[in-house]
């Protein structure tokens, strides 16, 4: 976006801050991640985890989930009002994996939520540190984006599985605030809105009364978030129509699906942040690194540098490929599930393969899985180069009305060509251009038709050596012109909802 007048940068959203200069932002983001690190160290002490066990990503995820659950006020209230069998609303816990006699064993732990909140606040100078919580949510969301497919969720809302590259952040909780809204893809916002409209169609009281007023405010706010992601006037005008509709119904759903399709070529701006597992920040803090003094950024070299010197382990199931498990976590760490594989491979320095070819399941281990044959391995999370994260969507020209990459939502600000079959996309746009949004639809289709596949996105932008922290010498990679690499082709991943 050219106009950054009223917009806050991601880091400001991330730390809940008002407008700050670069140094202040780096300091407050540093404060946020060092709080996460201190909390993690304290939890490892409480649980008496060995150094090795503390570096196990599955243990990190359990500890992260416990603190997120401890601060989930809405759910806590709900659990207290609707007591369910065998669930203590005041407790939280999960599986902790320990090394015993050369084997991994699972131990289920339970803690008072109050106690977890106390440890978290203590690690964060007595504050609630919601920014740190959101940061953990985004890391979990990025991990889900890399691990699961959302075909079923797309189909349920009347969208098309080919729109999977628009679904970033689809598993983020509603309470993830401005930082969460920034990383949600166009498809995710469309899906949330469609679900809302469908409830309104089925439930007459949804928009009525005092609750209905709050619902309406939430609806308009979500519309505005989505509108802010679009970069062309016609797409935004259509969002105004959807937002101002007196009684949102099927016409609005149609408009939203049309907009989601159009975003395959006229890309929305979606933020990308490298959010790492808590254990990585813990390791750095334990080794004496002062994040607040040094400053930290989620979109620059810092996360790459952190991963360069962190050793993280993962449990591996008997027939899984450790290299593939590493790729999954690497993609999650850099929010690169929707990036062009050619770009990811270049930055990582090893070939990144499509999800359909991965011999690995998710990182988390289900409670009914047998631990006997579980092994553990070091995750290879290092990279050959680093690159700046983007939120532009990769449209090519300055009028913002040009081609982005079809099955890709770019993560890195790195020059790439746009190989795409426009005919396959345009086929989805035959037919309906009547109704009150007809002129906007016509305009959007015109812009899409004039998109040229030979264009280049992020012209002149390159990757940087890890020694080049000031980003002075961009290395512009040249990619094989004719194949765009989507992670999702030939997909056989598990569904998120299972």
Curated annotation (Swiss-Prot):
Keyword set, alphabetical order: Capsid protein, Helical capsid protein, Host nucleus, Host-virus interaction, Ribonucleoprotein, RNA-binding, Viral nucleoprotein, Viral penetration into host nucleus, Virion, Virus entry into host cell
One Gene Ontology molecular-function label: structural molecule activity
Pfam families, per database record: Flu_NP
Subcellular location: Virion; Host nucleus
Top-level taxon of the source organism: Viruses
Motif (Bipartite nuclear localization signal): 198-216
SUPFAM superfamilies for this protein: flu NP-like
Stated role: Encapsidates the negative strand viral RNA, protecting it from nucleases. The encapsidated genomic RNA is termed the ribonucleoprotein (RNP) and serves as template for transcription and replication. The RNP needs to be localized in the host nucleus to start an infectious cycle, but is too large to diffuse through the nuclear pore complex. NP comprises at least 2 nuclear localization signals that are responsible for the active RNP import into the nucleus through cellular importin alpha/beta pathway.
Record protein name field: Nucleoprotein
Organism listed in the record: Influenza A virus (strain A/Hong Kong/212/2003 H5N1 genotype Z+)
């Amino acid at each position: 976006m050219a106009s950054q007048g009223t917009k806050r940068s991601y880091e400001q959203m991330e730390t809940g801050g008002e407008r700050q200069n670069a140094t202040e932002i780096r300091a407050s983001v540093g404060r946020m991640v060092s709080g996460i690190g201190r909390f993690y160290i304290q939890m490892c002490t409480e649980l008496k985890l060995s150094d090795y066990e503390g570096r196990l990503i599955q243990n990190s995820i359990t500890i992260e989930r416990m603190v997120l659950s401890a601060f989930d006020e809405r759910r806590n209230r709900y659990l207290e009002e609707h007591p369910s069998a065998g669930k203590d609303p005041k407790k939280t816990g999960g599986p902790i994996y320990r090394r015993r006699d050369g084997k991994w064993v699972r131990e289920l732990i339970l803690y008072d939520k109050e106690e977890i909140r106390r440890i978290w606040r203590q690690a964060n100078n007595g504050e609630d540190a919601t920014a740190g919580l959101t940061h953990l949510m985004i890391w979990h969301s990025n991990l889900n984006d890399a691990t699961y497919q959302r075909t079923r969720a797309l189909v349920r809302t009347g969208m098309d599985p080919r729109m999977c590259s628009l679904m970033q952040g689809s598993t983020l909780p509603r309470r993830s605030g401005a930082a969460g809204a920034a990383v949600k893809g166009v498809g995710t916002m469309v899906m949330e809105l469609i679900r809302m409209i469908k409830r309104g169609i089925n439930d007459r009281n949804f928009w009525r009364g005092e609750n209905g007023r709050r619902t309406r405010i939430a609806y308009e706010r979500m519309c505005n978030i989505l509108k802010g992601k679009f970069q062309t006037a016609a797409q935004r005008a259509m969002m105004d129509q959807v937002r101002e509709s007196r009684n949102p119904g099927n016409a609005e759903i149609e408009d939203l699906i049309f907009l989601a399709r159009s975003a395959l070529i006229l890309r929305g701006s979606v933020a990308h942040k490298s959010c790492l597992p808590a254990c990585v920040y813990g390791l750095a803090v334990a080794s004496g690194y002062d994040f607040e003094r040094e400053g930290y950024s989620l979109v620059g070299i810092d996360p790459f540098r952190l991963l360069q010197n962190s050793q993280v382990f993962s449990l591996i199931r008997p027939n899984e490929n450790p290299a593939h498990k590493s790729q999954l976590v690497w993609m999650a760490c850099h929010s690169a599930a929707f990036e062009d594989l050619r770009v990811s491979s270049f930055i990582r320095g090893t070939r990144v393969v499509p999800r359909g070819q991965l011999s690995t399941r998710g990182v988390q281990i289900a409670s009914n899985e047998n631990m006997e044959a579980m092994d553990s391995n070091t995750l290879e999370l290092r990279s050959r180069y680093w690159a700046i994260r983007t939120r532009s969507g990769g449209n090519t020209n300055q009028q913002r009305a040009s081609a982005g990459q079809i099955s890709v939502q770019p993560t890195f600000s790195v020059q790439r060509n746009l190989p795409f079959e426009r005919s396959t996309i345009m086929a989805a746009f035959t037919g309906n251009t009547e109704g009150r949004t007809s002129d906007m639809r016509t305009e959007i289709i015109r812009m899409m038709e004039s998109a040229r596949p030979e264009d280049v996105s992020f012209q002149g932008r390159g990757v940087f050596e890890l020694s080049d922290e000031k980003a002075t010498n961009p290395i512009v990679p040249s990619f094989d012109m004719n194949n765009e690499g989507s992670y999702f082709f030939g997909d056989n991943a598990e569904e998120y909802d299972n």
